[in-house]
Amino acid sequence: MLLVIGLGNPGKEYQYTRHNVGFIAIEKIANQYNSSFSTKKKFNCEIAETISDRQKIIFIKPTTYMNLSGKSVISVKTYYNIYPAKIFVIHDDIDLETGRIKFKTGGGNGGHNGLKSIDGVIGNNYNRIRIGVGRPQNNQDVADYVLNHFSKPEYKTVMQAIDRITSNFGLILENKLEEFKN
């Protein structure tokens, strides 16, 4: 069983912001598996489930705001008894250029409040799929930057990255994490 978490903020006003690339990506991946989201209040998230290659995949989008994402993650992880090695968090990363993808297991949270929240409840030994959204320019506040919408060229670049993640997601199911990293 895999738990795949897309980080973002709920609400239409945040739908296409940099901070919501995790939501955008997970919706596309779940759609690839013909799985649609429904709200589960007891888990504080939207959840979609599917079975692929005899393996159950649970996709979640926390309905808490980013800073409280751990609340959703711990409730789903506990209910389904999922080990951290089988948890994959998809999130924005300002330390990567727009559209760049990096995969890592464990490590620090890089100041990302969603990851801080998750680390606080399950530790940090889970997998992360980081999608670059670039850095703010001209002393722009980081919070303002990640809560703003992409420019059209940035959005196109990010969607190409999400397409690559989606088309290679099967490697995760096959436990070919080294291949997925590349």
UniProtKB/Swiss-Prot annotation:
Q: What is its EC number?
A: 3.1.1.29
- A molecular function GO annotation: peptidyl-tRNA hydrolase activity
Using the UniProt record, give the first listed, main subcellular location. cytoplasm
Note the InterPro entries from the entry.
Answer: Pept_tRNA_hydro, Pept_tRNA_hydro_CS, Pept_tRNA_hydro_sf
Task: List GO terms (cellular component aspect).
Answer: cytoplasm
Q: Which UniProt keywords apply?
A: Cytoplasm, Hydrolase, RNA-binding, tRNA-binding
Pfam families, A to Z: Pept_tRNA_hydro (PF01195)
Biological process (GO) annotations held by this record are: protein quality control for misfolded or incompletely synthesized proteins; rescue of stalled ribosome
Q: List the disulfide bonds.
A: none
The entry's tRNA-binding residues are 14, 65, 67, 113
Site (Stabilizes the basic form of H active site to accept a proton): give the residues. Answer: 92
Localization: Cytoplasm
Provide the reaction this enzyme catalyses. an N-acyl-L-alpha-aminoacyl-tRNA + H2O = an N-acyl-L-amino acid + a tRNA + H(+)
Enzyme class, spelled out: hydrolase
Per the record, where is site Discriminates between blocked and unblocked aminoacyl-tRNA?
A: 9
Identify which residues the record assigns to the active site.
19 (proton acceptor)
Query: Family per UniProt?
Result: Belongs to the PTH family.
Q: Which NCBIfam families match?
A: pth
Q: How does it assemble?
A: Monomer.
Q: What is known about what this protein does?
A: Hydrolyzes ribosome-free peptidyl-tRNAs (with 1 or more amino acids incorporated), which drop off the ribosome during protein synthesis, or as a result of ribosome stalling.
Q: Which PANTHER family match?
A: PEPTIDYL-TRNA HYDROLASE
Name listed for the protein in its UniProt record: Peptidyl-tRNA hydrolase
